[in-house]
Amino acid sequence: MDTKFDDVLTGEQKLRNFNINFGPQHPAAHGVLRLVLELDGEVVERCDPHIGLLHRGTEKLMESRTYLQNLPYFDRLDYVAPMNQEHAWCLAIERLTGVAVPRRASLIRVLYSEIGRVLNHLLNVTTQAMDVGALTPPLWGFEEREKLMVFYERASGARLHAAYFRPGGVHQDLTPRLIEDIEEWAEHFPKVLDDLDELLTENRIFKQRNVDIGIISEKDILDWGFSGVMVRGSGFAWDLRRSQPYECYDEFDFQIPVGKNGDCYDRYLCRMEEMRQSTRIIQQCLAKLRVEKGDVLARGKLTPPPRGEMKTSMEALIHHFKLYTEGFHVPAGEVYAAVEAPKGEFGVYLVADGTNRPYRAKIRAPGFLHLQAIDYIAKGHLLADVSAIIGTLDVVFGEIDR
C-alpha cells in the first residue's frame, strides 16, 4: 500500500528543510540586506544573499557627468565613512593628470581618512555588539561619532556627504580652532575605547557569541578576494597604507593589528586596536599641521583660482567659469587607484578618453566581495550566529549595490 498517508501509519515523519527570509526589514540586517536562509532545524544549510535593493546605477551615471560632478557620488557609496571613497577618486584623477598635491592638503587628507576609519569602526563594533545582545555600546559609540561628525561639518559644511577631497587637494583649509578641538578629542578618545573594552572584550556572553564563529583561513582569503580587517583578522599583515603607501602614510609611525584565529572575535579585536592606531596617526597629523603651513589646493587646470584673483583678472574669471561648466579634461589612459578604506581595499579603475568625462569607472567595493562569501562562511552555523557573522563582515549597501 503506497499512499500519501504512509508516514502517519508508520509514525515516521518526512523532514524537510525550512526556508526563511532574513531582512530586508530586520533589526540585525544592515540596511537593505536580504538573505534567503535554508535551515535544517536551527542549522544554516544555505544562505543566499539577494542584492540590488539599493542599486542606483552609479557607474553608468558617472559616464555622463564631469570628473568634479562625479565626486559626490563617492560619498554615497560607503556612507559610514564618506571621505575615504572620495580619496580613491581623487588619487585616480591625480595619477592620470600628473598633479602634485600640496603637502598641507596631503596631511589633511590623511587626518580625515583616519577620522573616517574611527567613524566606521565605532559604528561596526558597537552595532555588532548590539546584534548579539549588548545594548550599551551603541549609545557610547554614537556619542563619539557625533563629535566626529561635527568635525566633518566644520571642515566641509556637511555632516555626511562632504565632497571635501578635491582633485589637487582639499576644498578649504582647517581653522586653528578646529585643529585644537580635534587634538582635545584625540586625547580623551582612548578612555572611551578602554570603557568599550571593559564592557565587551572579556565579557563571557560576547565571547560565546563570537569566538570560533565565521572562521576564515588563508586559502579562503585568496579564493574570495577579501581585504582589510577580514584579512588581518586571519593573521595576514596586509594593509595598503603599509604595503603600497599612498599620500604621505609612509611618514607616520603606526602598527598594523593582526589576529590569530580569523574568527568574529579576532576581527572585533583588530577593529578596536585599529581605532587606537588611527588616534595615534591623527595626533601625529595634527602636530605636523601646526608646523607646516601653505596652500591646500594645487593651483592649475584642475582647481579654481583664488577668489581675490577673480575680482581683478579676466583670465581667472574665464578659468573659473569654464572649470565649473565644462570641467577639466583628463588625458587618455587608464589607472587603478586603491586606498585602505575602513572596510578593506576600495579601488577605482578609471578609463579616460581625453574628454571632460570618464569613459568608464569601475568601483571595487570591499563589502561586495565579503558578502559574496556569506554562504560559504555561514554554512553549518546556527541561525543566531548569522547576525554575528554579518556584523563582522561590515557590509554597507551603498557600496555593494552602488
From Swiss-Prot:
A Pfam entry, by short name: Complex1_49kDa
Family membership: Belongs to the complex I 49 kDa subunit family.
Cited function: NDH-1 shuttles electrons from NADH, via FMN and iron-sulfur (Fe-S) centers, to quinones in the respiratory chain. The immediate electron acceptor for the enzyme in this species is believed to be ubiquinone. Couples the redox reaction to proton translocation (for every two electrons transferred, four hydrogen ions are translocated across the cytoplasmic membrane), and thus conserves the redox energy in a proton gradient.
Record's subunit section: NDH-1 is composed of 14 different subunits. Subunits NuoB, C, D, E, F, and G constitute the peripheral sector of the complex.
Species in which this protein is naturally found: Cereibacter sphaeroides (strain ATCC 17029 / ATH 2.4.9) (Rhodobacter sphaeroides)
Gene Ontology annotations for the cellular component aspect, listed alphabetically: plasma membrane
Membrane topology per record: Peripheral membrane protein
Name listed for the protein in its UniProt record: NADH-quinone oxidoreductase subunit D
Keywords of this entry: Cell inner membrane, Cell membrane, Membrane, NAD, Quinone, Translocase, Transport, Ubiquinone
PROSITE patterns named in the record: COMPLEX1_49K
Molecular function GO terms recorded: NAD binding; NADH:ubiquinone reductase (non-electrogenic) activity; quinone binding
EC number(s) stated in the UniProt entry for this protein: 7.1.1.-
InterPro entries (alphabetical): NADH_Q_OxRdtase_suD, NADH_UbQ_OxRdtase_49kDa_CS, NDH1_su_D/H, NiFe-Hase_large
UniProt catalytic activity: a quinone + NADH + 5 H(+)(in) = a quinol + NAD(+) + 4 H(+)(out)
Location of the protein in the cell: Cell inner membrane
